[in-house]
């Protein structure tokens, strides 16, 4: 069985519920959470979302339950371990996985298409867009 067995934190395009469900068929949206002491940014030639440590800052995102096969699909989508590596943190004593870019290149404004997917995800998860707007004016 491929029942959901791990927790995943989405903060970029995977916040988009329809896209996430299409990519990871076993995924279940649990709730919105804030990752503390990190901030959102966009970088690389893909102009994609990334997170980096920053004191007293937060990254709003979504907690999903995913299966092992979902994780494999995400690994492919995130180009793990070339573009993104895995970062683990604890939320209410439970281990959560997320992705963070390997190369911390400079800020690059995302494409309109990508940004629209992220914005839709913020709506889907009912997240505060204040932090997204802040990330776009670096």
Functional labels for PLM-detected ranges:
Residues 4-138:
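Glycine-aromatic micro-motifs
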């Amino acid at each position: 069985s491929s029942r959901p067995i791990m927790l995943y934190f989405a903060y970029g395009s995977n916040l988009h519920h329809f896209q996430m469900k299409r990519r990871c068929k076993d995924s279940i949206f649990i709730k919105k959470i804030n990752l503390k002491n990190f901030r959102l940014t966009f970088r690389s030639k893909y102009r994609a979302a990334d997170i980096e440590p920053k004191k007293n800052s937060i990254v709003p995102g979504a907690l999903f339950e995913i299966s092992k096969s979902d994780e494999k699909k995400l690994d492919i989508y995130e180009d793990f371990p070339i573009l993104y590596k895995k970062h683990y943190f604890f939320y209410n004593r439970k281990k959560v996985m997320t992705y963070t870019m390997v190369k911390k290149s400079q800020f690059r404004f995302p494409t309109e298409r990508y940004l629209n997917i992220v914005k839709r995800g913020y709506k889907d998860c009912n997240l505060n867009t204040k932090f997204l707007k802040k990330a776009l004016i670096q």
